[in-house]
Design a protein with these regions (language model features):
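Catalytic cores of DNA base-excision repair glycosylases
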Residues: 1-166
Length: 166
């Protein structure tokens, strides 16, 4: 849903200045299909101000600076560092967490543990793309309820005890 919202927003406003010109209500009108859109719109406006005032209108290539932005945590910082700057980061979301624990590829009790294990086991040449593959696998095959184990290409490697074949 984020991609759909930004596909409508960016042709109209794709710079911090242009987004600020829309204001909170204007941003809301473009992102209302996203959960928590009210607080996210406010954070987007605050972030645009900070980008202009502290970073010359550019997104910083620095984890600490990214995580200091309103609404930006480790996962979002990892996504930005990976997709915008090509860093070998792995942003662990609910899909990746589920896939890694079900398959025992990189099990962990929390996203930080899963991320740490993934960074150790994923070969360097795959780190930039790995999180995209795992997200898609979790979103479309290894879904939360009734996973599609019968059509899973790694089913033979998976250690999930409650496999579903239908």
């Amino acid at each position: 849903s984020v991609n759909k919202a930004t596909a409508k927003l960016y042709p109209v406003a794709n710079t911090p200045q242009a987004i600020l010109a829309l204001g909170v209500e204007g941003v809301k009108s473009y992102i209302k299909t996203i959960g928590l859109f009210n607080s996210k719109a406010e954070n987007v406006i605050k972030t645009c101000r900070i980008l202009l005032e502290q970073h010359g209108g550019e997104v910083p290539e620095d984890r600490e600076a990214l995580e200091a932005l309103p609404g930006v945590g480790r996962k979002t910082a990892n996504v930005v560092l990976n997709t915008a700057f090509g860093w070998p980061t792995i942003a662990v979301d609910t899909h990746i967490f589920r896939v890694c624990n079900r398959t025992h590829f990189a099990p962990g009790k929390n996203v930080e543990q899963v991320e740490e294990k993934l960074l150790k086991v994923v070969p360097a040449e795959f780190k930039v793309d790995c999180h995209h593959w795992l997200i898609l696998h979790g979103r479309y095959t290894c879904i939360a309820r009734k996973p599609r184990c019968g059509s899973c290409i790694i089913e033979d490697l998976c250690e999930f005890k409650e496999k579903v074949y239908s």
